[in-house]
Structure formats: structure tokens, C-alpha cells
Regions:
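Extended beta-strand/beta-hairpin segments
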Residues: 16-90, 98-187
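Intrinsic-disorder-associated, low-complexity terminal segments enriched in Asp/Asn/His/Tyr and depleted
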Residues: 8-11, 17
């Protein structure tokens, strides 16, 4: 059973939540994230020409699986590897999902399924520079109770406001959630 759709909302970079206390500049914690990005595409000849080298690289962090990266195929990359644009869209989706699940659990809403098909839009300028113009998150969430539908849908607004990654980008991050009601898996 589908819940009523939520109005389309967007996080606007630099927007201030009118219901939030004014930001006083204080920080409660600082977190440091360190990764190694290593180019593996020299092929022995290095960057002797634009087409002479592979864009392949590896992304590593202690104790984690290696991520095989490249540029987008449109920029001579390997389409079988993750590109930075996909990783940015995935990071926005992951951050939103993790905040959403936290908020749902805190609100007593039982989520039994969460899937997202996010889409990022990037424009490229004649000189080769470019930027993202927006990311659209399209989460499909299943909750166990019909009475939780409205609140489950509005939690996306809170998740968007709290997501560290969405708060850090300079383009709109919109979300168009779909919430349905389903039964818990009894296995």
C-alpha cells in the first residue's frame, strides 16, 4: 500500500532552517577522514600525451576493500570502474539514507526496506570545466505501519537538513521519496 507522496523538497546550499537555533560557531567534534588515491594507469610511458595514459586508480583506506576508480568513460575512463561523479552521488545518497534510518529508529518507525536511485546532473563548459547543478535522491522506503506513513515521509526533510555531505555541497540536493507499507519478513 502506497503512502501519500511528499512535496518535492530541496536542500538549498547555505539555507538556514528557520526552526533551528542560530549557529553560534561552536563545534562539538571534529572528524578526520584520510584515504589514499593512487594512480595505477602509467603504463610505463606516463602522461606523454592526453591519450597515452589510463585514468585507472585505486582508492584505499586502512582495513577496507579497495575501490577501483577511473574517470567517466566520456573522459577516456574505464566504464567498469567507479568514477568521481558516481562516488559523489553515492555519498549523498548514503549520507541521506544513514541519517534517515537513524531518525526513523529514534521516532519508533520500523523501516524494513530502503532503496535509492539517485541521479546527479553535471554540466560541462566549453573549456572543459564543469560542475554539478543538482542531485535528485529518489528513496523508496517500506515501513510496517500505515499510521507511520506521514511521519516516515517527512523524516526525509530532517535527514536532508542533517546530512553532512549535502550540507557541504554548493548545489541543490532534492529528494522525491516514495513510502509504502509492508510486512516484516518472518524468516
Amino acid at each position: 500500500m502506497a503512502c501519500p507522496p511528499a512535496p518535492n523538497r530541496a536542500h538549498t546550499p547555505g539555507a538556514i532552517d528557520p526552526g533551528a537555533a542560530p549557529y553560534d560557531g561552536s563545534v562539538s567534534a571534529t572528524h578526520i577522514y584520510e584515504v589514499l588515491v593512487e594512480w595505477t594507469g602509467s603504463g610505463g610511458s606516463g602522461t606523454t600525451s592526453y591519450r597515452s595514459y589510463s585514468r585507472d586508480h585505486e582508492i584505499r583506506s586502512a582495513g577496507k576493500q579497495v575501490i577501483a576508480g577511473s574517470s567517466d568513460a566520456a573522459f577516456l575512463g574505464d566504464p567498469d570502474r567507479w568514477n568521481p561523479e558516481e562516488l559523489l552521488v553515492a555519498a549523498l545518497s548514503q549520507c541521506h539514507m544513514l541519517w534517515y534510518l537513524h531518525l526513523a529508529a529514534s521516532a519508533g518507525i520500523v523501516v524494513i526496506s530502503y532503496k535509492d536511485l539517485p541521479v546527479g546532473t553535471m554540466t560541462e563548459l566549453p573549456d572543459g570545466a564543469g560542475q554539478f547543478t543538482e542531485v535528485l535522491l529518489r528513496p523508496s522506503v517500506t515501513v510496517t505501519e500505515q499510521v507511520a506513513c506521514a511521519r516516515a515521509t517527512t523524516l526525509h526533510d530532517d535527514a536532508e537538513r542533517l546530512c553532512f555531505i549535502a550540507r557541504s555541497v554548493n548545489f541543490p540536493v532534492r529528494h522525491e521519496p516514495v513510502t509504502t507499507v509492508g510486512a516484516k519478513d518472518s524468516t
